[in-house]
Amino acid sequence: MAFLKKSLFLVLFLGLVSLSICEKEKRQNGEDEDENEAANHEEGSEEKRGLFDIVKKVVGAIGSLGKRNDVE
């Protein structure tokens, strides 16, 4: 009976250790994903700003062409 108790405790202990390790890895992966999302959000903002600048220039150029045609 004592042998079964020791075996059972050993199995439970090893199960808890592996569960603890898995939880720790999940937390680390979650933090990494949060950091990646923040970096992607910043890159997306920079891309939007760059695109907005290009659109502004194109609209300005089209507007100036329209003004030139009105003058002629």
Swiss-Prot record:
Q: Please report the PTM annotation for this entry.
A: Amidation is essential for antibacterial activity against Gram-positive bacteria.
Q: Which residues form the propeptide?
A: 23-49, 69-72
Keyword S-adenosyl-L-methionine carried by entry: no
Leucine amide occurs at: 65
Q: Establish whether keyword Signal is in the entry.
A: yes
Pfam families for the chain = FSAP_sig_propep (PF03032)
> What's the stated role of this polypeptide?
Amphipathic alpha-helical antimicrobial peptide with weak to moderate activity against Gram-positive bacteria, and no activity against Gram-negative bacteria. Probably acts by disturbing membrane functions with its amphipathic structure. Strongly inhibits the formation of NO by neuronal nitric oxide synthase (nNOS) at micromolar concentrations. Acts by a non-competitive mechanism, probably by binding to calcium/calmodulin and as a consequence blocking calmodulin attachment to nNOS.
What protein does this entry describe?
Aurein-2.3
